[in-house]
Amino acid sequence: MTAIRYEFIKTCKQTGARLGRVHTPHGSFDTPTFMPVGTLATVKTMSPEELKAMDSGIILSNTYHLWLRPGHEIIREAGGLHKFMNWDRAILTDSGGFQVFSLSDFRRIEEEGVHFRNHLNGDKLFLSPEKAMEIQNALGSDIMMAFDECPPFPATFEYMKKSVERTSRWAERCLKAHERPQDQGLFGIVQGGEYEELRRQSAKDLVSMDFPGYAVGGLSVGEPKDIMNRVLEFTTPLLPDNKPRYLMGVGSPDSLIDGAIRGIDMFDCVLPTRIARNGTCMTSEGRLVVKNAKFARDFGPLDPNCDCYTCKNYSRAYIRHLMKCDETFGIRLTSYHNLHFLLNLMEQVRQAIREDRLGDFREEFFEQYGFNKPNAKNF
């Protein structure tokens, strides 16, 4: 019995997007879905109860950061990550690979793994496929990610080819080192940059290993959105229909819709809480920076079309005041709103798939949000 099971429900006749449900040891969630990111075993400023009120069925935590603080052994002693953070729904943990390649100034890649420096204190560390599995097995997440190399954009074909081959070998080692396949599902990560030939090779390698789910990695690392969409168009069809598909590190509203249209089931990103901390809010009418002076006497909600806790109870003027005074409650209110906005957006996407009208929904949303305007601002 596998720990993770994907249930296909239907395909949107207008776009080919798919509606489904992922079953995990800690409950099920409908897809396509957005996963709030709780890097250090907390979604910044949010309580588990608030996330449940938004109907979040799965969140993401970070293997690299939890390995450094408080340490995976402490979390194991606490009974696993679910008990440690009082979250009884699904958790996905990444492998730590992205942080190793993005946060460390010094790193040396070899076949065994990666030597790098702790970004907190400069200590020398080593992370391998086996170590990434050991940490994630201790954390006890429902979905684990294989340890991979995530090259930046752009990278040469020659470098990316070697990287893909190494990532495939590391994926095989992850499968062998994974100690709890009946309790935790391990996803493989398809790499290959913008190169179709390499994406095909990576997908072929990983699909032959029969992971319970697959991620598309190496996107949202600086490439233009048209390249990301093109890569998804030739990569997603290479993945099994009966397994979940996860696009890593993507969370802008337009990319969530475009990813779903291209067959993606799961997304994650720090974007909604990161931009909330500087007062940037997602609304049904586009991007709103609540710190702006024009909102000082605006006593309406952040988004008149939103029914979240923030919008039902507090005004733009009040939230602006809190943000200008560096009050934590202001960050809580904007974070709550942004997370609710994306989770609600995904429910609208699922409903549009049910009604076979996701293409129409995309056009309506892009027009209302302002993505169709020349030089439209993104996040």
Curated annotation (Swiss-Prot):
SUPFAM superfamilies: tRNA-guanine transglycosylase. Its EC number is 2.4.2.29. Gene3D superfamilies: Queuine tRNA-ribosyltransferase-like. InterPro entries: ArchSynthase1/Queuine_TRR, TGT, TGT-like_sf, tRNA_ribo_trans-like. One of its GO terms (biological process) is queuosine biosynthetic process. Binds 1 zinc ion per subunit. Pathway: tRNA modification; tRNA-queuosine biosynthesis. GO terms for molecular function: metal ion binding; tRNA-guanosine(34) queuine transglycosylase activity. One of its GO terms (cellular component) is cytoplasm. It catalyses: 7-aminomethyl-7-carbaguanine + guanosine(34) in tRNA = 7-aminomethyl-7-carbaguanosine(34) in tRNA + guanine. It comes from the Bacteria. Substrate binds at residues 94-98, 148, 191, 218. Transmembrane segments: none annotated. The keyword Mitochondrion does not apply. Its cofactor is Zn(2+). Keywords: Glycosyltransferase, Metal-binding, Queuosine biosynthesis, Transferase, tRNA processing, Zinc. Belongs to the queuine tRNA-ribosyltransferase family. Catalyzes the base-exchange of a guanine (G) residue with the queuine precursor 7-aminomethyl-7-deazaguanine (PreQ1) at position 34 (anticodon wobble position) in tRNAs with GU(N) anticodons (tRNA-Asp, -Asn, -His and -Tyr). Catalysis occurs through a double-displacement mechanism. The nucleophile active site attacks the C1' of nucleotide 34 to detach the guanine base from the RNA, forming a covalent enzyme-RNA intermediate. The proton acceptor active site deprotonates the incoming PreQ1, allowing a nucleophilic attack on the C1' of the ribose to form the product. Homodimer. Within each dimer, one monomer is responsible for RNA recognition and catalysis, while the other monomer binds to the replacement base PreQ1. This is Queuine tRNA-ribosyltransferase. The gene is tgt.
